Swiss-Prot record:
Residues 72-222 form the HD domain. The gene is dgt. It comes from the Bacteria. This is Deoxyguanosinetriphosphate triphosphohydrolase-like protein. One of its GO terms (biological process) is dGTP catabolic process. Residues 1-35 are annotated as: Disordered. SUPFAM superfamilies: HD-domain/PDEase-like. NCBIfam families: dGTP_triPase (TIGR01353), PRK03007.1 (NF002829). One of its GO terms (molecular function) is dGTPase activity. It holds the Pfam family HD.
Length: 428
């Protein structure tokens, strides 16, 4: 393996759960070792079917809404790009953070967080459903790439550091925690793979690369959801300068983010309103000049939020290359408050729209009805990848997990096609 300036990662970080033989199809004399292990991992994520399916999964509005929709796939590409730039500034391996950005939503079901809510309702008695835990399950089990010695899938068989970089919430489900990273509590669960990835890691502490990915995710969707809202006419940035509107945003933000004070959120709204790049957007009208002003705004905000975290982290950790548990990412509260205000803009003017809420209710009903139909007719209703797992499952919880895995893998187009064709029978 060729050395790089990121050689502060060691063999433990680069270890794979299942040892792999050398490639056998290379021409004699061909150099097959010019990529790092993390570059290979990034390629595995980039080429996997689960990533491609994100093109037909909702980010905020549906993937078939408008001419230039943001989907879970385009969002993941944006997170990967922001994270990669931050990694370079922090001395983390950029391929490692890049792949974490690509994979961070790979477990999302149809209809994004709304679909996640529906599947969690269906599976609540058997471990629930959480997109981040589904990420881990896809990467370590469901996505076909490598088999272990017993013929069982090891998923993409990514390195330990790569899997950890995708893990925002490195803990199991508990009553106190709505978010979690691993499914456990049923036969043949994901606990052994989770234990292997987290071997020697501080309890409940995400690695630095995962923290960078998480902040890149926050930056991407806060800025770009607002951009999409402005283009659609649902958001007018001039509301930031309105005292009543700013107060409403601050109240929403304080309720959603208890670590942020109301007055800090109010001050953040004022700072945003006073930025020249915000004022330049004004009342967006779709002209070339307006589009350029909006694109400049998004570029400057992404840079502001990403660079603030790099600078603050460097002030604490110094200038050395950083990896895994060398440091935590330090994000100034001032910047966290600004990102929170942008999130609340999208929440108030897009996600809370009555028509949007009705669409979401219909989506959840559709998922519930498909789940009933698949369950009633399983294993015959399941894909060849999932039917044997259902037949081999030892109890209803494990069998339901297989049905959930199949639904989570659907694109929205396929889910709707299955829904139209279903012939549900009541459960016995």
């Amino acid at each position: 393996m060729n050395a790089t300036q990121y050689d502060h990662y060691d063999d433990f970080d680069r270890e794979r759960l299942v040892p792999e033989p050398a490639k056998s199809a290379a021409l004699p004399g061909t150099d097959t070792e010019h990529r790092t292990d993390f570059a290979r991992d990034r390629a595995r994520v980039l080429h996997c079917a689960a990533l491609r399916r994100l093109a037909d999964k909702t980010q905020v509005v549906g993937p078939r809404h408008g001419d230039n929709p943001r989907t879970r796939l385009t969002h993941s590409l944006e997170v990967a790009q922001i994270g990669r730039g931050m990694a370079i500034g922090l001395g983390c391996d950029p391929d490692l953070v890049d792949l974490a950005g690509l994979a961070h939503d790979i477990g999302h079901p149809p209809y994004g967080h709304n679909g996640e809510r529906a599947l969690n309702e269906i599976a609540k008695a058997f471990g629930g459903f959480e997109g981040n835990a589904q990420n881990f399950r896809i990467l370590t089990r469901l996505e076909p790439k490598v088999l272990d010695a017993d013929g069982r899938s090891a998923g993409l068989n990514l390195t330990r550091a790569s899997l950890d970089a995708v893990t925002k919430y490195p803990w199991r489900r508990t009553e106190e925690r709505r978010k979690f990273g691993f499914y456990v509590g049923f036969p043949d669960d994901d606990g052994p793979a989770a234990d292997w990835v987290r071997d020697g890691a501080p309890v409940d502490r995400p690695c630095l690369e995962a923290q960078v990915m998480d902040w890149a995710d926050d930056v991407a969707y806060s800025v770009h959801d607002v951009e999409d809202g402005v283009i659609s006419g649902r958001i007018d940035l001039r509301v930031l300068a309105d005292a009543d509107a700013a107060e409403s945003l601050a109240q929403l933000g304080a309720a959603a983010f208890p670590s942020l004070a109301h007055d800090d959120l109010l001050a953040a709204a004022q700072r945003l309103s006073e930025m020249p790049v915000v004022a330049a957007v004004g009342k967006y009208d779709g002209t070339l000049a307006a589009s350029v002003a909006l694109k400049r705004l998004t570029s400057e905000l992404v840079g502001r939020f990403a660079n603030a975290a790099i600078t603050e982290t460097r002030a604490v950790a110094g200038d050395r290359p950083l990896k895994r548990f060398d440091s935590d990412l330090v994000v100034p509260d001032l910047v966290r408050a600004e990102v929170a205000v942008l999130k609340m803009l999208a929440l108030q003017f897009i996600m809370s729209d009555h028509q949007h809420l009705q669409v979401q209710a219909d989506q959840r009903t559709r998922i519930h009805e498909v789940a009933l139909a698949l369950w009633a007719q399983a294993p015959g209703s399941l894909d060849p990848q999932f039917a044997p797992e259902f037949a081999a499952a030892g109890d209803d919880g494990a069998r339901l997990r297989v049905v959930i895995d199949q639904i989570a893998s659907y694109t929205e187009t396929r889910l709707e096609r299955v829904h139209e064709a279903r012939s549900p029978r009541p459960l016995e």
